[in-house]
């Protein structure tokens, strides 16, 4: 019985220490650069998703329905990005996020845990967060463009467009009529 337990433990330890490196023609240094930039973006996308869902759930006021639906749509779009980003990192030979703790340590999006936030303040805060995400995506695009990670650059271009659209909708939705 002891030998069987020792063998299982040995097998488990061996599997845990096995390298998780996907071969990539981009090379180890490029894979590291892609993973670094894309993981930073991924943490921000997860944090922005959570903030958007938080505001979606705690929306109140005369424009509740419109804002509630807008934020739900935007949160869905952000969540859809997460797996594509993580899989892109893995496809190019990198390692990606493993926990909520990892996200919390790296994210640059500032959480908002306030009990109440005015609806227009919610939209303004999300607009600013999306603008910052656009800037970060552009920074990573420069890196992947330089190392000719064409598929990664192409995905980032689409995400920039989606993020600019979210920013635009948040801006237009928060304008006050005269």
Features from the language model and the residues they span:
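Helix-loop segments that flank and shape redox-cofactor active sites
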Residues: 25-33, 48-73, 140-151
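Disorder-to-helix initiation segments
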Residues: 19-41, 119
């Amino acid at each position: 019985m002891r030998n069987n337990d020792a063998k299982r433990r040995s097998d488990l330890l061996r599997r845990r220490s096995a390298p998780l490196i996907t071969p990539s023609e981009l090379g180890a240094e490029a894979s590291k650069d892609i993973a670094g930039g894309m993981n930073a973006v991924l943490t921000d996308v997860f944090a922005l998703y959570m903030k958007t869902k938080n505001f979606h759930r705690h929306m109140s006021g005369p424009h509740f329905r419109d804002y509630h639906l807008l934020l739900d749509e935007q949160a869905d779009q952000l969540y859809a990005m997460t797996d594509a980003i993580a899989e892109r990192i893995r496809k190019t030979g990198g390692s990606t996020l493993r926990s909520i703790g990892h996200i919390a340590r790296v994210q640059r999006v500032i959480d908002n845990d306030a009990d109440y936030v005015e609806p227009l303040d919610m939209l303004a805060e999300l607009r600013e967060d999306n603008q910052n995400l656009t800037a970060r995506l552009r920074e990573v695009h420069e890196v992947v463009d330089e190392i000719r990670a064409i598929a990664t650059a192409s995905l980032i271009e689409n995400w920039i467009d989606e993020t600019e659209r979210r920013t635009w909708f948040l801006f237009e939705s928060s304008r006050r009529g005269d």
